[in-house]
UniProtKB/Swiss-Prot annotation:
Belongs to the glycosyl hydrolase 20 family. The keyword Repeat applies. Residues 38-59 have a biased composition (Polar residues). It is found in: Secreted, Cell wall. The modification Pentaglycyl murein peptidoglycan amidated threonine is found at residue 1284. Residues 118-177, 1277-1286 have a biased composition (Basic and acidic residues). This is Beta-N-acetylhexosaminidase. It comes from Streptococcus pneumoniae serotype 4 (strain ATCC BAA-334 / TIGR4). Residues 621-1046 are annotated as: Catalytic domain 2. It holds the Pfam family G5. It catalyses: Hydrolysis of terminal non-reducing N-acetyl-D-hexosamine residues in N-acetyl-beta-D-hexosaminides. Residues 1285-1312 form a propeptide. GO terms for molecular function: beta-N-acetylhexosaminidase activity. Residues 1-33 form the signal peptide. The lineage of its organism: Bacteria, Bacillati, Bacillota, Bacilli, Lactobacillales.
Length: 1312
């Protein structure tokens, strides 16, 4: 074979001038025949099914002009299009006859059919046959003979008017109805490339739901297309005289698919999943059309065949092997493929109607998109090395597959490009029963048969015009061929009836198919973009799509079932509106959707106007009261930054219970990590980190963040006790371990455990946030959080995994923007979804803060919909978080964590937002259900409750219990209808009821029973008095319990009195423990003035008393006494200034010896971090940041004891200056031969991200022209929300910013 002969053949093509190209695109119509325009190829213009193939030329544009009658094709080279008027004049006049009036819409014109004599013969032949498919074809032909003709046959306007006037009104109405029904009967299909890319059953069901909603009839599912992503339970294949075992075939196909693309979301659908999917679609009235493509697009099957021992199954063209196409000369490979198709067809038999066998793009990857020409070449260039009788073998192969499919009662379908390629019918005939999915009219050098020829050959046509194509990931103009904008424009300009390459004829179609392809299977699937494509296609062809009746059905279902609760007048209006919906025409199209929508709106209006009867009104109010009480009322405590003792947390639980809260949200991991399990062994990265090592590392990490003098971490025993204690008070506990931000302690711990560089690094190294590219760090953190989830599983209901404020300290609060810029946002979504899945696997409800979810209201990635969103902020300038409305549209529910209610310990008004007074004010101003950035009730989104938050951004700030209780009380008092009344007294009384009620009088038991029955457990704080009355009644009934009378009268002389067992009763009695008042003199206060330093709180002692009643005499015995509430002594400062020297006798007063204050300075040693520098000579080091020791001031009270010794007591410890970490670079560059690698290391250059002062564009530029992001740095406002992760000591920078803002009269809110 000579190379030049290959070249001679490969360049065989025709072209027309540039003017024709421009005209073709301008008119958006097909202007040339098969030997048409050769477009300029660009690298971003792949084919329909394959990235590497050539794009469509102008000849692919479909026709919207009037069409000629189907005639035998006359020889021609180039067909040009003239204006419509000229074309009408030049059309053949073989069938002119008076015509009835036709619609002038493009869709109606396209529906016109003019059969040829060949078609009539086909119709007559089909009329004699009995198969349902052929009956359908007969009906089509009949329709062709009686429906509207082309524009050339229209009579003049006056003749049209006369003809219309002569027709009876009923006849005209029937014809219009028949036209509507014909259009609605067409198939409207959405195609999903589930062969290249894995789609989960849930995703496919969502697509089916949308298809139903928009009026589609079918889902076309390519399960075999390059990849093979559907596996039967039994995959045993018998071919070539042997049987390939099922498990062997499964393993081979799974490997073959993974070799094509190893999709992280899954490999394939199972048989049970497919069966469920088909049934689900059937219930929705949607058919399913499966595709297993061959002989091309078989990458996975070819790889599988090689795994199973079939040699050389791939087609080869002059030494270049096709990765996707089977060699039709390889009998073993062909036999195996046919057996496989037979296996799948047998499964789909009686489940579906149509089976697509593919047949497109033969070996385009090995022949430069000349596969069909190569197969036909031997006939015209014999003995030159082309496949002998290649095209004849392809026809035989296609017909064999059609026969296999039909043997299972299915209709075969195939793509058009290989059928009668180059309009050459001399090689043989294709089975006429193959439905042709007409997707392309070809392009320069890709000369497919016209749809006219295919129709003449008796094939039904499914219009799959590639003008409507969308390739996943190509979401806008400039992102490659078949991008979404291109598809939407194609839909706008190309109606469903515009078939590719008609050559001027009207082509009857069975329907239209819009397609989404996965040429790049790693590209993200965006449901909203697919649904946009589907919606536009339905709207553009509204007359063909059924109207949405589901919304009407839903509106009917939402009518209250019990209408007896409403007034007769309002019920009558509802019934009339219901009747109007039920009487709607059942064959309305999407174009008539307004008729349905108006009826629905009327029904909804009448339902909203239903008026309750007085009795029902009371019931409804009671129901609403219960619904409000069912909302979560949560108090959040930042126990990750600051250490809280078990006793402090119990007292918070007590107060929460008293006020009617439902839960305590405990951030145990938030910058610091202040909860350690007994066993902290972590297995990750192929190794096990010992428990003691992990504990030590976490403690050191937490202390490095803040060494709290009150303690470092809660133990497992303490947290277990806290959970049980809260449970006894009807309080739930919601744990939070925050990541990948707010991980200061964990990051230090990982480094100490040998995990290098776990921190994110942008403008600088983040102290708070993990690097999502560091797989070792990610694996460790997931294992650690999984450990905590294991502990809380079964003990709590919700687990918060955080995910807020990514690397705000290293990006000027632009972390999410940076993630998107560096294309790491998908990694974040994957990480968040993994944590959500881990929580669900353990029976926990996953929760997260809202920051990172769908940043900027964009669905660039997909997040787990089951996550409960703790919504605290819409963001601020430059921090564009998703709106609550957008998240609600994604199906999320919220725990309202409105930042208006935030209090940061120690915060003062001059510090910014988050101070106590403002938080207390906002509990009265911001409604319970009002989410940040919205107004309630105008915006009423689905919330499960609300959360009040206490933050410890400055962990050294003093915790004052009374402040927290004041804020908790204010929140409860301003939302009394949501907060449960104080049931503590009721719990105590219920605990007093004897477990054994035998021996008490019937009357007293009945009174007790009545008191218990009257109890209402759904009273809110507005009805505390009602509850107190119920408790008093129960208490009185308990006190009224009396022993039953066992006999009456006197005993007989022989009668023995019955033995009555007298049992003691256990009661509890509480007494108050008064607090002491401790007075301390303060020389700085005026004489006689007092100042309460610590408010006194009375304690409580509970006595457990045994009460024994015998012969009417009651004896009480105290069994035990316990202090159940500790006393807090009141500390009061009393003014006692010294105003003079000497008293009236001239003597100086004797002063009380008071303790003195001793301040001692302590040095805090700096830590050293070592980083490798590939640009520095090996063995050399250089200090990048010089370490500076910090200073801690310790305040001691020094007093003298009675024996004269000094007693020193630590009063407080304050870090006066933080230590500065020393960063040292160690060189790794080798400059000589003979090192371990034999050459010098090559330094990796990383882009430095800088944020200039000017605003950044709203969307990032294309990759090839990428510049550094220019988002503005955030400014600071007076409403400073908690720094949930930023400790920035750059005082000069802050001062400079504030000075600049002061010049504009601005202040900035910094919400962390």
């Amino acid at each position: 074979m000579k190379h030049e002969k290959q070249q001679r053949f490969s360049i065989r093509k025709y072209a027309v001038g540039a003017a024709s190209v421009l005209i073709g695109f301008a008119f958006q119509a097909q202007t040339v025949a098969a030997d048409g325009v050769t477009p300029t190829t660009t690298e971003n213009q792949p084919t329909i099914h394959t990235v590497s193939d050539s794009p469509q030329s102008s000849e692919n544009r479909t026709e919207e002009t009037p069409k000629a009658v189907l005639q035998p094709e006359a020889p021609k080279t180039v067909e040009t299009e003239t204006p419509a008027t000229d074309k009408v004049a030049s059309l053949p006049k073989t069938e002119e006859k008076p015509q009835e009036e036709v619609s002038s819409t493009p869709s109606d014109k396209a529906e016109v059919v003019t059969p040829t004599s060949a078609e009539k013969e086909t119709a007559n032949k089909k009329a004699e046959e009995a198969s349902p498919k052929k009956e359908e074809a007969k009906e089509v032909d009949s329709k062709e003979s009686n429906t509207d003709k082309t524009d050339k046959d229209k009579p003049a306007k006056k003749d049209e008017a006369k003809a219309e006037a002569d027709k009876p009104a009923t006849e005209a109405g029937k014809e219009r109805a028949a036209t509507v029904n014909e259009k609605l009967a067409k198939k409207k299909i959405v195609s999903i490339d589930a062969g290249r890319k894995y789609f989960s059953p849930e995703q496919l069901k969502e697509i089916i739901d949308k298809a139903k909603h928009y009026g589609y009839t079918d889902l076309h599912l390519l399960v075999g297309n390059d990849g093979l992503r559907f596996m039967l339970d039994d995959m045993s294949i018998t071919a070539n005289g042997k049987t390939y075992a099922s498990d062997d075939v499964k393993r081979a196909i799974e490997k073959g698919t993974n070799d094509y693309y190893n999709d992280p979301n899954g490999n394939h659908l199972t048989e049970s999943q497919m069966t469920d999917l088909i049934n689900y679609a059937k219930d929705k009235g949607i058919g399913l059309i499966p595709t297993v493509n061959s002989p091309g697009h078989m990458d996975a099957i070819l790889n599988a065949m090689k795994e199973l021992g079939i040699q050389n199954p791939n087609f080869s063209y002059f030494g270049k092997k096709s990765a996707r196409t089977v060699d039709l000369d390889n009998e073993q490979a062909v036999a195996f493929t046919k057996a496989l198709i037979d296996k799948y067809a047998a499964y789909f038999a009686k489940k579906t109607e149509i089976f697509n066998i593919g047949l497109d793009e033969y070996a385009n990857d090995a022949t430069d998109a000349k596969g069909w020409s190569v197969l036909q070449a031997d006939k015209y260039y014999p003995n030159e090395g082309y496949p002998v009788k290649g095209y004849e073998k392809f026809i035989a192969y296609a017909n064999d597959l059609a026969r296999i499919v039909k043997s299972h009662g299915l209709k075969p379908m195939a793509f058009n490009d290989g059928i009668y390629y180059n309009s050459d019918t001399s090689f043989g005939s294709f089975d006429k029963d193959i439905i042709v999915s007409m997707w392309t009219g070809g392009w320069g050098g890709y000369d497919v048969a016209s749809s006219k020829l295919l129709a003449e050959k008796g094939h039904q046509i499914l219009n799959t015009n590639d003008a409507w194509y969308y390739v996943l990931g190509r979401n806008a103009d400039g992102q490659g061929w078949y991008n979404l904008d291109q598809g939407l424009n194609g839909i706008k300009n190309t109606p469903i009836t515009s078939v590719p390459k008609t050559e001027g004829a009207d082509i009857p179609i069975i329907g239209g198919m819009v397609a989404a392809w996965a040429d790049t299977p790693s590209a993200r699937y965006s449901p909203s973009r697919l649904f946009k494509l589907m919606r536009h296609f339905a709207n553009a062809n509204a007359e063909y799509f059924a109207a949405d009746y589901e919304s009407a059905e839903q509106a009917l279902n939402e009518v209250p079932k019990d209408l007896n609760r409403y007034t007769a007048e309002s019920v009558t209006a509802v019934k009339e509106a219901e009747k109007a919906i039920r009487s709607l025409d059942s064959n309305l199209s999407r174009a008539q959707q307004d008729t349905i929508d108006q009826a629905i709106a009327k029904l909804q209006e009448t339902v909203n106007n239903l008026t309750l009867t007085p009795e029902a009104q009371k019931e409804e109010e009671a129901k609403r009261e219960v619904e409000k009480l069912a909302k979560n009322k949560v108090i959040s405590i930042d126990a990750g930054r600051k250490y809280f003792t078990l006793n402090q947390l119990k007292r918070i639980v007590d107060k929460a219970s008293e006020l009617g809260y439902s839960d305590v949200h405990l951030l145990l991991g938030n910058d610091g990590l202040r909860f350690l399990l007994d066993d902290m062994t972590i297995t990750a990265n192929g190794k096990t980190y010992a428990s003691d090592d992990v504990k030590k590392a976490i403690i050191e990490g937490t202390k490095a963040y803040y060494d709290d003098p009150n303690g470092t971490a809660l133990t497992q025993a303490e947290v277990t006790e806290l959970i049980e204690y809260a449970k006894s008070k009807d309080i739930g506990l919601i744990p939070a371990i925050n990541s990948p931000g707010h991980m200061d302690a964990m990051l230090v711990a990982m480094e100490k455990l040998g995990i290098k560089n776990p921190q994110a690094h942008f403008d600088k190294v983040s102290k708070t946030t993990m690097d999502l590219k560091n797989e070792e760090a990610m694996n460790f953190v997931k294992a650690l959080i999984g450990k905590y989830m294991d502990f809380f599983a079964g003990k709590t209901k919700i687990f918060n995994f955080g995910t807020d404020e990514y690397a705000n300290d290293a990006t000027s609060a632009q972390g999410w923007y940076y993630l998107k810029w560096y294309q790491l946002y998908g990694k974040f979504a994957e990480y968040a979804n993994t944590l959500a899945a881990m929580a669900k696997e353990r029976g926990l409800q996953p929760m997260a803060f809202n920051d990172g979810f769908y940043y900027e209201d964009k669905d660039d990635v997909q997040f787990d919909k089951d996550v409960l969103i703790s919504y605290w902020s819409k963001g601020w300038w430059g921090y564009n978080l998703a709106s609550p409305q957008y998240l609600a549209s994604k199906g999320y529910k919220f725990l309202n964590t409105n930042g208006d209610w935030y209090y940061i310990l120690g915060q003062k008004p001059e510090d910014g937002g988050g101070f106590l007074k403002k938080a207390i004010e906002n509990t009265g101003k911001t409604p319970f259900n009002q989410l940040a950035s919205t107004k309630y009730p105008e915006v009423d989104l689905p919330t499960v409750g609300s959360m009040l938050s206490i933050w410890a951004d400055r962990p050294s700030a003093e915790y004052k219990e009374e402040e927290i209780f004041e804020l908790m009380t204010a929140f409860a008092d301003h939302n009394k209808d949501y907060f449960r009344a104080n049931y503590n007294a009721l719990r105590e009384e219920l605990a007093k009821i004897p477990t054994n009620l035998e021996g008490y009088s019937k009357e007293s038991l009945e009174a007790l029973d009545a008191a218990k029955t009257a109890l209402n457990y759904n009273l809110n704080r507005n009805k505390q008095a009602e509850l107190d009355t119920l408790v008093a009644n129960l208490k009185a009934a308990l006190q009224g319990l009396k022993p039953a009378v066992t006999h009456s009268g006197s005993l007989d002389e022989n009668e023995v009195a019955a033995n009555v067992e007298t049992r003691p009763e256990l009661i509890t009695r509480t007494e108050e423990i008064p607090f002491e008042v401790i007075k301390k003199e303060n020389p700085n206060l005026p004489a006689g003035q007092e100042n309460i330093i610590t408010a006194g709180v009375k304690g409580e002692r509970t006595h457990y008393i045994s009460v024994l009643t015998e012969n009417g005499k009651t004896t009480e015995t105290v069994l035990d006494s316990q202090v159940t509430k500790e006393v807090i002594n009141q500390v009061v400062e009393v003014g006692a200034p010294v105003t003079h020297k000497g008293d009236e006798s001239g003597l100086a007063p004797t002063t009380e010896v008071k303790p003195r204050l001793d301040i001692q300075e302590e040095e805090i040693p700096f830590t050293t971090v070592t980083c490798e520098n590939p640009l520095l000579l090996k063995g050399k080091t250089q200090v990048i940041t010089k370490g500076v020791n910090g200073h801690r001031s310790n305040f001691y009270s020094v007093s003298t004891s009675a024996d004269g010794k000094e007693v020193k007591t630590l009063v407080n410890s304050v870090v006066a200056q933080e230590a500065v970490t020393q960063i040292v670079e160690v060189g790794t560059m080798v400059t000589h031969v003979g090192d371990e690698n034999g050459q010098a290391a090559i330094a990796e250059e990383k882009p430095k991200l800088e944020i200039p002062s000017q605003p950044a564009p709203s969307t990032a530029p294309a990759e090839e022209s990428k510049v550094l992001p220019q988002d503005p740095a955030p400014v600071v406002t007076e409403k400073k929300l908690p720094e949930t992760g930023t400790h920035d000591s750059a005082g000069l920078v802050v001062a400079g910013l504030m000075s600049t803002l002061a010049a504009y009269g601005l202040t900035k809110r910094k919400e962390d």
